[in-house]
């Protein structure tokens, strides 16, 4: 399959047939098997909170996953990342830790380094691979090297604007990449500091907003098309993509649109024909593998107006809130969230 090509979204009866086709999990997914069951009595510690800009999202994710795991019969403790954490882990020796931390320290590999230092099993990608995925330009470089497509971009540190003057640099950006553009921090999630720039006079304000969340900005050519989020899960049988979720919003898909119910419309599975859905899913799996990710990830892409799947970014700690995309995809696949999360935990239970 050529993962850089595709066809426009199906409509009418064809779209309905395609959605019906992918909603049958036995046809496309082989995620959960009898040997994935976790023995009763397991103790899971969920790390949620932290000090990043995404603290509240992390806490909401932690509560949701804890509810599902408890319903699946596991003992669950939620703990913040603070001075009590390491003594707590030493005293309680949980079977596995699940870091549901978003933003710095949670996704940049730091907390995973610490968990490995103290010998605690955990759900998710390792430290080195997390660091690569956390950096948007590094992740784009890796997936481009793997033969996938991604919008043209440039990275610019804040210091460069002080040294060269902002306007000449921004003029050069527009001359090279054109308009519209997307400005985003090179690190971070939840669309914090992200701006869609339609006119050149909007670019200076977008840079100021971006630099509020980091010292380096990634400016990429904006792509028009169908916005999709594709979650990948690996329970030890190889990575498999859940049904892509189509994201439709009247304005930018910003923080409020992501986490306030009713601001955004989601279609799970996406309203695309079966062949295109397969291509989109393959792109997400290839990105997951190229970056060396483990257990779960979410890849954000756009199916552009030429039918090309454009990689935007990847998340090693996908949100698990009531409006988050991985849970929506799992439900679209007919999967029980408690069983899915329990199976992810089982892969790392302390033996």
Q: What feature does the model see in each segment?
A:
Residues 1-25, 31-32, 36-39, 273-351:
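ATP-dependent carboxylate activation and anion-phosphoryl transfer catalytic cores
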Residues 1-138, 157-169, 343, 347-351:
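ATP-binding N-terminal substructure of ATP-dependent carboxylate-amine bond-forming enzymes
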Residues 58, 151-155, 180-205, 227-229, ...:
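Glycine-rich phosphate-binding loop of ATP-grasp-fold ATP-dependent ligases
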Residues 76, 121-122, 150, 181, ...:
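Hydrophobic beta-strand scaffold residues
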Residues 143-144, 173-191, 215-224, 228:
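ATP-grasp fold ATP-binding core
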Residues 146-185:
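Rossmann-like NAD(P)H-binding beta-loop-alpha module
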Residues 198-282, 303, 308-310:
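Phosphate-binding site of ATP-dependent enzymes
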């Amino acid at each position: 399959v050529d993962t850089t090509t595709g066809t426009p979204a199906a409509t009418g009866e064809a779209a309905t047939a395609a959605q019906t086709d992918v909603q049958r999990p036995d046809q496309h997914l082989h995620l959960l098997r009898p040997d994935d069951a976790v023995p009763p009595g397991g103790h899971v510690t969920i790390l949620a909170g932290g000090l990043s800009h995404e603290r509240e999202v992390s806490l909401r994710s932690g509560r949701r996953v804890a509810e599902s795991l408890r319903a699946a019969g596991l003992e669950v403790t939620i703990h913040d990342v603070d001075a009590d954490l390491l003594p707590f882990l030493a005293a309680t020796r949980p079977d596995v830790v699940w870091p549901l931390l978003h933003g710095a320290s949670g996704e940049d590999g730091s907390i995973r380094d610490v968990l490995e230092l103290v010998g605690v099993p955990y759900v998710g990608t390792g430290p080195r691979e997390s660091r690569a995925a956390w950096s948007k330009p590094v992740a784009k470089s890796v997936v481009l090297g793997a033969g996938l497509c991604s919008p043209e971009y440039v990275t610019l540190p804040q210091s460069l604007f002080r040294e060269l003057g902002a306007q000449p640099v921004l003029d050069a950006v527009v001359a090279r990449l054109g308009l519209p553009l997307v400005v985003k921090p090179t690190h971070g999630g939840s669309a914090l500091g992200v701006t869609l720039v339609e006119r050149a006079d909007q670019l200076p304000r977008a840079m100021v907003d971006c630099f509020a969340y980091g010292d380096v900005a990634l400016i990429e050519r904006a792509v028009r098309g169908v916005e999709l989020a594709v979650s990948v899960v690996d329970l030890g049988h190889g990575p498999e993509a859940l049904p892509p979720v189509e994201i439709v919003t009247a304005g930018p898909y910003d923080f409020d649109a992501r986490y306030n119910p009713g601001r955004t419309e989601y279609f799970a599975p996406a309203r695309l024909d079966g062949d295109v859905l397969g291509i989109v899913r393959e792109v997400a799996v290839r990105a997951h593998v190229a970056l060396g990710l483990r257990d779960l990830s979410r890849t954000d892409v756009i199916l552009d107006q030429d039918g090309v799947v454009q990689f935007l970014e990847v998340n090693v700690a996908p949100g698990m809130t009531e409006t988050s995309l991985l849970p929506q995809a799992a439900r679209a696949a007919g999967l029980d969230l408690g069983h899915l999360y329990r199976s992810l935990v089982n892969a790392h239970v302390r033996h």
